[in-house]
Amino acid sequence: MNLEVKKIDTANARLSAKLSVENLEKRYDKIAQKIAPKVKIDGFRRGKVPLSLVKTRYQAQIEQDAQEEMIQEVLKNALKELGIENKDLIGSPNFTKFEKKDTHFEIEADIGLKPTIVLDKIKECVPSVGVEIPNEEKIDERLKQLAKDYAKFVDTDAQRKAQNDDKLTIDFEGFIDNAPFEGGKAENFSLILGSKQMLEDFEKALLGMQAGEEKEFPLTFPSQYHAEHLAGKEALFKVKLRQIQAREALEINDELAKIVLANEENATLKLLKERVEGQLFLENKARLYNEELKEKLIENLDEKIVFDLPKTIIEQEMDLLFRNALYSMQAEGVKSLQESQEKAKEKRESFRNDATKSVKITFIIDALAKEEKIGVHDNEVFQTLYYEAMMTGQNPENLIEQYRKNNMLAAVKMAMIEDRVLTYLLDKNLPKEQQEILEKMRPNAQKTQVG
């Protein structure tokens, strides 16, 4: 074997090798001898098939296995010459040449190595952080909302007319072209008027009705309605209002605190106000971080933390971004790229900057997570996906299986780790008094959230 290895920088190396055809043919014989005892061909007993016939019948598999063996040997020797271990190899080598000549094979490949990352400029990267402290007005607004949310619905007198925030029990049936349609009928159906549980025009038609009253009204389904067979159609609805219930107002006092903080001993309005203030602070913090500071922190990390990146990983990320773009493109756009190799190359190349930044930030986050011992358990990933399923009306098991099938669970975990690392860095840069608010909130993290 004739091998040359050149280290380009701390994260990249290039190898070129020449291997004799004779070397490869010897591998063919060894592999054929290895599989021969398991081969069964009509007319021969198992294990008694002539080696020449095994090599002919399984030529493609034998050649592939031999080439893979040869590649692994080349890589092993290249790493040895570089003085690095296999665990320091990143991703798969990118073979730029694999040619068979008359007497030998010529191989050239780019190798990605684990980058060396120095985290001495992290403090310079973290932007100044100042979260808005909730004022009395905001606290009072949330207390009023809590009083409303926890209020029970009670029966009303027969003369009451339906108004927003009332709970109605109705029977209804819809017709299109004088015929009932699927999903257009229900009995003893409950809805909160004004909650947008039903179409806005449907709820508006119920305003002012009294218990026992019946009503007919036309309704046009939106052109973008989720049920395609109803989108844009004109319907006639017949509704009977069975019952109206109104919220029984709750006073903002210690009794409300005991209801909201049911898991707390000796809950008081003072304690509830403290919890509300803390919850509002956390919401303000999350909004500031997600809408502004995390992105600023990422930009600073990208700019100030400098190290060599493995080019093979950048190329793989470009491939991923290019494939994702193809999935979201119109058929005409995909066809245009298929017909022009030059256009396809240009499109793929347009993702280089994004791919480079993505790879770089991933390496930085991984290094920070290890240094600060920040991780995410698999169960937390599943909980996140369960929540996503609930919010989107999907089956949790099906959603998790979909992520698993598409090898996306690792990406979800990495995104969660990134979020925790960025939050950790920003939290450390909070003013002292705001860090104290956070510390005060942590013992109550598992208790009832307010609002």
UniProtKB/Swiss-Prot annotation:
One of its GO terms (molecular function) is ribosome binding. Keywords: Cell cycle, Cell division, Chaperone, Cytoplasm, Isomerase, Rotamase. Its EC number is 5.2.1.8. GO terms for biological process: 'de novo' cotranslational protein folding; cell division; chaperone-mediated protein folding; protein transport; protein unfolding. Residues 165-250 form the PPIase FKBP-type domain. Consists of 3 domains; the N-terminus binds the ribosome, the middle domain has PPIase activity, while the C-terminus has intrinsic chaperone activity on its own. Involved in protein export. Acts as a chaperone by maintaining the newly synthesized protein in an open conformation. Functions as a peptidyl-prolyl cis-trans isomerase. PANTHER family: TRIGGER FACTOR CHAPERONE AND PEPTIDYL-PROLYL CIS/TRANS ISOMERASE (PTHR30560), TRIGGER FACTOR-LIKE PROTEIN TIG, CHLOROPLASTIC (PTHR30560:SF3). This is Trigger factor.
